[in-house]
């Protein structure tokens, strides 16, 4: 019975299998960090975009604050204020949705390293706080705008009422003679019906001016009331954004508490290590003879090593 030695073939097969496994492992090692780096860069890009949008919204808020604090009627710019209010409201709604999506991305990456997840959660919490502060500032500015508009409307109504009282010829307490009396008018003859009342050109002009002023005031008041209603509806929508932010913050509360616990443990461990180092230093400082002995032994071994070599 003859035997065939196939040891060389077996060794060649093992070598080929090992090389294939090494190649696969190397590819995984190369692809893993690249994929992680890509995901990390994507998260960073989205977070940076949200942060830039929050900064741009803050700049618009500064401009809106300057316009809203103007109290005089001639410096008021209602159209520009309405445009800025609409833009800021849309930006806040978009930012709220983007942060919620970013939080879902963080939740979907739970299999990543703990340190990376912790960093991502901290970034999301920071963005939520920035958005909450921006929304609160926007709410305060809208409230200031509402107060100024109501005060301006009250002043306008008082001015119109005062002007109407002064211009009305029927309300004149200082004159006992009827202002409508015109001594140049012809007297009625006997048995003649005389029912015409001559107000004069000046009185008619005053009445026309007052009617025009009241019409303009009514239009202005309606515009003011419409603006106030829009601002109040915007404040109500901001309340919804605050509710969503509160929900997201409550979801992050457990993470923050866990981070605080880890921080306390780290501080405690650092304090314990510092105390142990101080104790060791004190023991070594009190035993200088041992230090000299150790130093002498080291020198002796060094000299012996030099002599031998």
Curated annotation (Swiss-Prot):
<protein>
    <recommendedName>
        <fullName>Integral membrane protein sed5</fullName>
    </recommendedName>
</protein>
<dbReference type="Pfam" id="PF05739">
    <property type="entry name" value="SNARE"/>
</dbReference>
<dbReference type="InterPro" id="IPR021538">
    <property type="entry name" value="Syntaxin-5_N"/>
</dbReference>
<dbReference type="GO" id="GO:0006886">
    <property type="term" value="P:intracellular protein transport"/>
</dbReference>
<feature type="topological domain" description="Cytoplasmic">
    <location>
        <begin position="1"/>
        <end position="288"/>
    </location>
</feature>
<feature type="coiled-coil region">
    <location>
        <begin position="37"/>
        <end position="66"/>
    </location>
</feature>
<comment type="function">
    <text>Required for vesicular transport between the endoplasmic reticulum and the Golgi complex. Acts as a target organelle soluble NSF attachment protein receptor (t-SNARE).</text>
</comment>
<dbReference type="GO" id="GO:0000139">
    <property type="term" value="C:Golgi membrane"/>
</dbReference>
<dbReference type="InterPro" id="IPR045242">
    <property type="entry name" value="Syntaxin"/>
</dbReference>
<dbReference type="GO" id="GO:0012505">
    <property type="term" value="C:endomembrane system"/>
</dbReference>
<feature type="topological domain" description="Vesicular">
    <location>
        <position position="309"/>
    </location>
</feature>
<keyword id="KW-0333">Golgi apparatus</keyword>
<keyword id="KW-0813">Transport</keyword>
<keyword id="KW-0812">Transmembrane</keyword>
<keyword id="KW-1133">Transmembrane helix</keyword>
<dbReference type="InterPro" id="IPR000727">
    <property type="entry name" value="T_SNARE_dom"/>
</dbReference>
<dbReference type="GO" id="GO:0031201">
    <property type="term" value="C:SNARE complex"/>
</dbReference>
<dbReference type="GO" id="GO:0006906">
    <property type="term" value="P:vesicle fusion"/>
</dbReference>
<feature type="domain" description="t-SNARE coiled-coil homology">
    <location>
        <begin position="218"/>
        <end position="280"/>
    </location>
</feature>
<keyword id="KW-0472">Membrane</keyword>
<dbReference type="GO" id="GO:0005801">
    <property type="term" value="C:cis-Golgi network"/>
</dbReference>
<dbReference type="GO" id="GO:0005484">
    <property type="term" value="F:SNAP receptor activity"/>
</dbReference>
<comment type="similarity">
    <text>Belongs to the syntaxin family.</text>
</comment>
<dbReference type="Pfam" id="PF11416">
    <property type="entry name" value="Syntaxin-5_N"/>
</dbReference>
<keyword id="KW-0653">Protein transport</keyword>
<dbReference type="InterPro" id="IPR010989">
    <property type="entry name" value="SNARE"/>
</dbReference>
<dbReference type="GO" id="GO:0006888">
    <property type="term" value="P:endoplasmic reticulum to Golgi vesicle-mediated transport"/>
</dbReference>
<feature type="transmembrane region" description="Helical; Anchor for type IV membrane protein">
    <location>
        <begin position="289"/>
        <end position="308"/>
    </location>
</feature>
<dbReference type="GO" id="GO:0048278">
    <property type="term" value="P:vesicle docking"/>
</dbReference>
<keyword id="KW-0175">Coiled coil</keyword>
<dbReference type="GO" id="GO:0000149">
    <property type="term" value="F:SNARE binding"/>
</dbReference>
